[in-house]
Amino acid sequence: MAQQYQPGQRWISDSEAELGLGTVLAQDGRLLTVLYPATGETRQYALRNAPLTRVRFSPGDVITHFENWKMTVREVDDVDGLLVYHGLNAQNELVTLPETQLSNFIQFRLATDRLFAGQIDQLSWFSLRYNTLEHTSRQLQSSLWGLGGVRAQPIAHQLHIAREVADRIAPRVLLADEVGLGKTIEAGLVIHRQLLSGRASRVLILVPENLQHQWLVEMRRRFNLQVALFDAERFMESDAGNPFEDTQLALVALEWLVEDEKAQDALFAAGWDLMVVDEAHHLVWHEDKASREYSLVEQLAEVIAGVLLLTATPEQLGQDSHFARLRLLDPNRFHDLKAFRAESENYRPVAQAVQELLDKGKLSAAAQETIHGFLGAEGDSLLAAVNTGDEEAKSRLIRELLDRHGTGRVLFRNTRAAVQGFPERKLHQYPLPCPVEYLELPVGEHADLYPEVSFQSHSDVSEEERWWRFDPRVDWLIDTLKMLKRVKVLVICAHAETAMDLEDALRVRSGIPATVFHEGMNILERDRAAAYFADEEFGAQVLICSEIGSEGRNFQFSHHLVLFDLPSHPDLLEQRIGRLDRIGQKHTIELHVPFLETSPQARLFQWYHEALNAFLNTCPTGNALQHQFGPRLLPLLESGDDDKWQTLINEARSERERLESELHTGRDRLLELNSGGAGEGEALVEAILDQDDQFSLPIYMETLFDAFGIDSEDHSENALILKPSEKMLDASFPLGDDEGVTITYDRNQALSREDMQFITWEHPMVQGGMDLVLSGSMGNTAVALIKNKALKPGTVLLELIYVSEVVAPRSLQLGRYLPPAALRCLLDPNGNDLASRVSFNTLNDQLESVPRASANKFIQAQRDQLTPRINAGEEKIMPKHAERVAEAQRRLAADTEEELARLTALQAVNPTVRDSELVALRTQREQGLAMLEKAALRLEAIRVLVAG
């Protein structure tokens, strides 16, 4: 007897019908491997419960050969477990077609099979299926797909960069925004949009070890991306041959990777579509030598098509270091440092001319001569129009110059000066007497920046002698919190021990409601603490964070920040302030800094305030100044030499002012315009906010929850609690937690309550729920009674829902041109299509349900009459399908031709346009047009309506 599965047999997936016809490749032990050639996907299933249905056609069925000729089946043979079909082709010739040669694009009329088998569903399920198809089609066509679902306020420059970069094939770019402008969010948006569109399916994220947790939190909380964090322990403990092959998104610390050659080999072997490198400016490169970290990233960049480098601004880095980043992206274009320097110098006068145009609205004779020399005669007409005040000509001139910018397509750099929306900062300093207990610490310890830690570690103290009972900063904190009453206050200190001690102090000494947040807590515990702090009515007044514990969190609903101590590096200070100082902060940031007089704390405060001006403004020069003056700074924090100290402060202040002046004069306004989007980002923001205000998603989700047996109840304003009910239909529904979850559709609520799921059309719960509806068969049949006086009792109407779709690899992004769309046909007894006159919702309002037994009895009695009418429906709907396909082909051809023309022209004046981009675009066009030619109609659902 033949085995159940044989290589070559054709099966269809019950849960992923969109994959097309599958072919059994192998049966290995308890695993079954099936290839889906239409999409290039391979799946492995457990042999005992594989969700597959055998494809077996019957006499009378019309089937298609992979070379696209058709035959009508007359006989079916089973030869060693494989089916062989015999029948007649279009020329009425006898032909044979083994199942191994069936077209991969054959569609199945499962709705018809279920209808005549008596599997008739509720009317609510039929409506849910139709609405799911409609929403899926709408979202796939949306320009916001992959941009609107992030848990963040929509910000113009971030959205512009994300769309511009994510819509490229294998993007290779440098994201170099100033601190606080959201490079991590930009990278997350690019990753998210590339994954949703299919342009990328495997992403590698390389970060410094101290940023791993921040990235993990950002990707999971903001984007719902399940990133796998790899370190030496996880890599060694994995049972897989190559642990990296088992994950779609890998987060890896560069420090570990450089030291582990086995991990490097596995990483290279795994294959990736996109690599993201954070803090790329720390990769050291010189003309004669590169660091191990740089060399490793360089080797990866050679084999990974898409590369995103997140880095400091070019002005901070210096030209040589900036060149080192660019050569990672395109070593052929950026191969000679001297040539790059010369090119940059040649371009500087053009950037200055644009600065003049933007500042004054017109161009001097010298600036016009500069632009003429850069654009040639073709720019003269634009210059003439600009001189008459033509705003459109001004925009076109800037675009022409940008297209010729040496790094305009690969570098995105926004500055705080160019981006609006940041709050002001106000500093409150509180010098306090240093307690004698700290002065009596062992020699050498009293100079510590964190004396409370030294006191606890060097003293065998009782509960009554703990440091927070005598430290004046604690008294000051209690008094300040009482003065601010119920105002939310964020406190940050360097160590987790200090944070926990402060919580104890507030509880014991004041009763002020407080919660703590540190690296020793897991993500769930941190979420609860953040939620307790965010709750306006019953929450904590104060949240006490350690340095590391607050990474990646956003507390901008608060605007009072207490720096209980000061960090040892200005970048860490900026990170602390950045918890509140973000775009969208509605209040002035109130910075409260208590410090102990005549201590290293006092001098460090003076260094940050007087030398670096780091409290009242961001300090882009802080890292350079710390590096330059650090060797002199640290000893003087401990020394009492006032003259040397004041000399250091004065020198550092002068150097900062000089560097800031260089940064300002070196600003490339043309590049800022490109990075900001010149209005395109604002349009995206408006569209996302409009989408947020619509009620279609909550209405749809309520019907989805009802269908699957998910109970929902009010939690608070704009929030719901979801729990699985006893009648839950499918345990695989992606609720996220078996015990239940709290959700909100409100973006502002989600930003302040990170314990709540932010539900958008892109959320895994929504996408997973919709997939369950469409991949299953529930709702593809229904029978109803229609109450309409215009219809004679007993009249039978037939409502047929077809899906017009193309089965193709997601990377081709054909969903933008031909998304799966529900085409509706409403046939009367005479074969007339009434769908254009009677909408789906209008019809629904006239229907009543029919008991299943009665419905089944009616269908069986009417089978012979219904079958030809169902077949006739496809003829009625085919012109609509053909029209959609033709329009999709036209749009695809037009879009790619326009982009090819633009890039080809651009390549002539800007070498950063790679040949590979043009080749990939042409290939994508040809493959896309060929796939659209195979687009098919599929009968998705049937509803039989009987007038009564």
Curated annotation (Swiss-Prot):
Q: Where is this motif: DEAH box?
A: 278-281
SMART domains associated with the record: DEXDc, HELICc
Q: Does the keyword Membrane apply?
A: no
* SUPFAM superfamilies according to UniProt: P-loop containing nucleoside triphosphate hydrolases
The UniProt function text for this chain reads: Transcription regulator that activates transcription by stimulating RNA polymerase (RNAP) recycling in case of stress conditions such as supercoiled DNA or high salt concentrations. Probably acts by releasing the RNAP, when it is trapped or immobilized on tightly supercoiled DNA. Does not activate transcription on linear DNA. Probably not involved in DNA repair.
Q: Which family does it belong to?
A: Belongs to the SNF2/RAD54 helicase family. RapA subfamily.
> Quaternary form?
Interacts with the RNAP. Has a higher affinity for the core RNAP than for the holoenzyme. Its ATPase activity is stimulated by binding to RNAP.
Q: Name one GO molecular function term.
A: ATP binding
Q: Where does ATP bind?
A: 177-184
Q: Which Pfam families would you find in this protein's record?
A: Helicase_C, RapA_C, SNF2-rel_dom, Tudor_1_RapA, Tudor_RapA
Entries under Gene3D superfamilies matching the protein: 2.30.30.140, 2.30.30.930, 3.30.360.80, 6.10.140.1500, 6.10.140.2230, P-loop containing nucleotide triphosphate hydrolases, Tandem AAA-ATPase domain
What is the name of the protein in this document?
RNA polymerase-associated protein RapA
Enzyme Commission number(s) of this protein: 3.6.4.-
**In this protein, which residues make up the domain named Helicase C-terminal?**
473-627
Q: Answer whether the UniProt record assigns the keyword Nucleotide-binding to this protein.
A: yes
Q: Which GO terms fall under biological process for this protein?
A: regulation of DNA-templated transcription
Annotated membrane-spanning segments are none
Q: Per its UniProt entry, which superkingdom is the organism in?
A: Bacteria
Q: What UniProt keywords are attached to this protein's entry?
A: Activator, ATP-binding, DNA-binding, Helicase, Hydrolase, Nucleotide-binding, Transcription, Transcription regulation
UniProt domain Helicase ATP-binding: residue ranges = 164-332
